[in-house]
């Protein structure tokens, strides 16, 4: 039986004049539709994803299943750049939703204009704007869909914002600035940190002030003081302060001005507010302000000291210690300073009485900095950790030769007794060479004690 086919392709794949394939695989590069067996031409065009508006359609007949174009009889070539081609296709497939979506997906503005009666009909039942936003469409297509009274939904706007298509989002918002649209747009712009468009919407459209609450929370998390202050001028701060967990968001704003504004409007804190403090200079000013308000800092002093140390802020660390801290607080801060290699803070905390062997744990185990190690040894650190020598054993396993040599020179002893571990360490220290080339015939004959001695020798002799 002779079957009519439509072959969608381009001249990279098919020679349309001679009906010759330029590629080996027909179905991978071209869309082949049997007209007799399919009434969903447009759906297949859309699903194939590779049909473009500069492609052509070869209409031909074949008696057998088509695996190549040999023995096929071409009837006509239809170019998709010719609008009349779609009249022919519509005569074969009256389901035009996929066709309109294909026009949108390939930015075929002229075709959309030509079939605007179909666009208007379809827009009543399908969210064409949302579909357009999900594609890489031009502004002309967006404006055309608006002119065709296509719905501008919240989903369309949030999709555009999420995909950073802010020019499209702005057009859609301007076309449908309902209170709900503005509310959701501001919220989504806050979440996506799109400051410029947020400011545009804020300045050009007014909504009930309670709708600003969710946006303000996100700008607090974003730490944008300019936007926060603008929104604070537009809301009832006392009403906003009733929001759940608002104290934590106020602190996360990282703005002393914002914190003071809320306190002036009656917001009160409890000691757990210190859990939301960040490690930077502005947060330190906020901490001092909250302490001056009388909020007890002592339940969270270890955390506050740790933040000072990790951020390397000497003045704030000194401020907190001068307020009054326990010996244990100083010791914990000291271990943090060692682990962070903050030399000046280590010196200061030792001066303030930090126990260098706090909890029978050598502080040296908290660092891999050779200068810090030497300083700790100078100040009396127990590098043998009560005889267990955990520090040297750990350092050897981490391949820190200079660090290990310093420990061995100051009395540490290698006590590892796992043979496999000793063998691995020794071979790595000798770059995989066996000791049999020197004094021993077979490395496997060495005792654990021999291996420890060899490792000690390799470390001490390393450059």
From Swiss-Prot:
Question: By what name is this protein known?
Answer: Putative ankyrin repeat protein R579
Keyword field: ANK repeat, Repeat
Report the Gene3D superfamilies cross-referenced here. Answer: Ankyrin repeat-containing domain
Any coiled-coil regions, as ranges: none
- Note the InterPro entries from the entry: Ankyrin_rpt, Ankyrin_rpt-contain_sf
Q: Where are the ANK repeats?
A: 124-154, 156-181, 242-271, 273-299, 300-328, 329-355, 356-385, 387-416
